[in-house]
Structure formats: C-alpha cells, structure tokens
Amino acid sequence: MKKKQVSHAIIISVMLSFVIAVFHTIHASELTPLAQMAEGMERQDVSIDKWTLHAKQNLSLTEKEFYQKVQRLKQEYRQYDWVIAREDKMIKAIGTYTDKKNRTSFRLQLVTTLKKHNPTSYLLYEQMSLETPDSWNDTYEQFERETLGIFQEKVVIFTCLNGHLDDNMNIVLQKKANQLLNEFQARSVEHVVEPNFVSISAFTDEWEEYIMTSKHKMNLQIALRSAGMGGKHTVTVGTPIVTTEY
C-alpha cells in the first residue's frame, strides 16, 4: 500500500513539474521582448529605472528629398519640437516631445549624408521612460503600431532596460550576469570581465532577430557595473544596437 502511495506521489510530482514547465514556456512565448526582459530582471531583484525602445529605417535621400520629408514629418507630428542641425557632411532633423505626466519622451530623427552619389540616410524613432508601465506587453505592442505608422513597413525594434541592484546586497557581478543569462535561456558568445564591470554578448532562441559578431549570432547584451564598496550596482539588459547612431 505504501509503495503504491509513494509511486502515485512520484507520478503526481512529475506531472506537476511537466505542467509548470509547459506553463512557463507558453507564458514566455506570449511575452514581447520588453516584457521578457523586465520580468527576468525583476526575478533577479533588479529594480528598473529606465526603459527605451528604438526603431530604425534605412533610406536614400538627396538633400532636396530630405527637406521634403522633414516638412511631412513636421506636419504629421506637430506636437514635436523640431530643430535642424547641419554638420560637416551630414544634416539632421530632430523632433522631440515629452509626456510630462508619464515621464516619457519621444524622439524622431532624420539623418542624411551630403553626398552627390549614394547618400546614406535613416529615420530613427525612440521612446524612453522613467515610469514602469501598467503592461510591458501593451507598451511594446503600442510602439510596434506607432513604428508601422511612421515607417509604413515592419522594422526591427531594439529594446534596452536600465536598473540597479540593492546597495546592501552582496553581489558577485559575474555570478549575477550568469543568472540573468539563464533567465533568457541565453548562451554567452563574447564577454569582458573586470573587477567592477562585466559585459556579455549572448544569443537566445527566444527572439528571432539577431546580428552577427565576427563568428557568432548575437541578440542579447547584459552589462553590470559596480561603483565599488557601498556603491550602486547598475544593470543594463538589451537587444544589440549600434549605439553611436542613437
């Protein structure tokens, strides 16, 4: 009788483990990258301070076409404050808008190089906030809809979250970085480890988009920095972008 009870208990335990694993898999598949990152950071006791979403569209505009597009953007996004900056061999139009109530800022940036042949141009759209939204999923999906309206096509969205760990926690940076990797079922492809800084480039099958390093696919970056004894531990998690363009 006892053997049967033990056997039944083992079967039930295995079934429960299977159900929980399936639930987590289904739950993760329903989440946007922004929501997955936020939930993963929160499970690792990271308090989120700021989040940013970026989208970019490559274009090819002459100087005349650049100004024509700027006029269209100004008419469509009248709530934005616009400035035009001319640099050495480049011209930029930057539009900014701030939702003070929700501590959220928006930026549109149109850039083109001043070349006679094959000018390089791109349009950037960015949303940044210091507030935690009611729904990470809804926020990401709203941004997707906005990018479709701006770019008139589906583009890749880049995600970045900045946060911090409790100053009183005894943190080993590399260990915490590996725990964050595990949250996203990611594997490291490149890393830099210093006494007060850890940076990891990684790849996860959770998301379709990726960029290539010299040898590997990469679609996740994790960085942790400590200010030293008693200092704040900062954490950044995001999908890889060419930051100099932003």
From Swiss-Prot:
A Pfam match: DUF1779
Keywords attached to this entry: Signal
Signal peptide stretch: 1-30
The keyword Signal is assigned to this record: yes
Gene3D superfamilies linked to this entry: YwmB-like
Top-rank taxon: Bacteria
InterPro entries (alphabetical): DUF1779, YwmB-like_sf
Protein name per Swiss-Prot or TrEMBL: Uncharacterized protein YwmB
Organism: Bacillus subtilis (strain 168)
Name of encoding gene: ywmB
